[in-house]
Amino acid sequence: MEIREALTFDDVLLVPAKSSVLPSTADTRTQVTRSIALNIPLLSSAMDTVTESSMAICMAQAGGMGVVHRNLTVEEQAREVRRVKRFESGIVYNPITLTPDQTLADAKALQDRYNVTGFPVVDEAGRVVGIVTNRDMRFADRDDTPVRVMMTSERLAILQEPADREEAKSLMKARRIEKLLVTDGQGKLTGLLTLKDTEQAVLNPTACKDELGRLRVAAASTVGDAGFERAQALVDAGVDMIVIDTAHGHSEGVAHAVERAKALSNEVQVVAGNVATAEAVRALIGAGADAIKVGIGPGSICTTRMVAGVGVPQLTAIMDCAQAAGDVPVIADGGIKFSGDFAKAIAAGASCAMVGSMLAGTDESPGETILYQGRSFKAYRGMGSLGAMARGSADRYFQKDAASDKLVPEGIEGQVPYKGAAGNVLHQLVGGLRAAMGYTGCATVEEMRRDCKFVRITGAGLKESHVHDVQITRESPNYRIG
């Protein structure tokens, strides 16, 4: 038997090259799938201590994308997707509406379900007759109060199609209002514009958005009928990308799940994983996958390689899979500890990277905040940990029918230092990538994937690469040991 050598991020360094590229001018745009572009090559992990709607919103505003985890009921996960799609919507087409005969109770129920603060009021023909805002509802005493009593029906701020953003902003400023109704020539409601959305568009010019100006969001699903039903609900909620998320993507079940998910919609992209070999990549592309997620056991909280003895060191896995994928994007999932690892993953052939531990300690992550020995931490666990598997992710590790005391975990539960806003972490990650692009003379992500060269280093070389012979007295925001 021939035993092949394989490398990971700490085994190599990028070789500097002649460069006219300034880090500030480097182009970090990339394709996460064949049809969806990102402005920064980053995804947040589909983990229950990393990504729900708050993280997904932050990721999309920064130019990346969040993948909402699936340790939620189908309806809960779909609700998280809807929250992202409605957070910064440009023009909200087909907004949630009320009729004059509905009640305050109906409005509250819709408010809770869709996380919105106001509703256009329309008649049976779809013509605008009023608007109800959160302020109007606060002054109503009874749940059976009709909408017609609460709504504002006079001097409505209405803009006819085609709606111009600058005209809309001027009208809202002149009328001192936060919502603007958009109608067609017959007075029928076609959309809704909010002041918040117009302001967010200015604050986040590189946000990752769909054709309608809504933030993009992905969500995880699984195999079998349960996965198909979940995928259907996610499509109905407006998800942009479905991730068939399993520990071992090279299986007939995953390939079949890709085929079924692709049949749901021509608009939604399907990512499949996780894999670590060229053969697996070819199988999933043959099933119709729009991108491949690479990584068997490299994550900081993953114990698959110790429990099962299976995996491929991440750098080699990325290189093998990217070569086999051709023009189908590859996502490097796991093992990234520093921004330099992120740059190495891109140089190895990944179109983008997925990070978990680096974002788990941020404000936007759903993990519990813990105070320990005078410092703040946030809970972080692998989806193969006992706690996560008991909550619903056991099928990711093909243990769906196992009793809770018979589960064989492939991950641990722990904590990571509190890091503040996720935006700061993303800034440092992308800043490190830009620095690498400057050092290697690569103006674009595609050039970096194609032109970079590696040099293999020894243990002494790794020691030399880290801070040495000094005691750190003030921590850096992008470098931490232990």
What positions do the PLM features span?
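Bateman/CBS regulatory modules and CBS-like beta-alpha motifs in cytosolic regions of diverse proteins
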Residues: 24-39, 45-47, 76-116, 121-123, ...
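Glycine-rich phosphate-binding active-site loops on the catalytic face of alpha/beta enzymes
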Residues: 61-76, 239-251, 290-308, 336-370
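Active-site-adjacent beta->alpha loops and helix N-cap segments on the catalytic face
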Residues: 24, 73-82, 140-144, 188-208, ...
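Alpha/beta catalytic cores of nucleotide-metabolism and tRNA/nucleoside-modifying enzymes
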Residues: 1-20, 98, 160, 170, ...
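Short, ordered loop/turn segments at secondary-structure junctions
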Residues: 70-73, 124-126, 133-137, 185-187, ...
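Terminal amphipathic helices with adjacent charged low-complexity linkers/tails
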Residues: 70-84, 121, 125-141, 172, ...
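Catalytic cores of alpha/beta
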Residues: 54-58, 229-237, 270, 276-294, ...
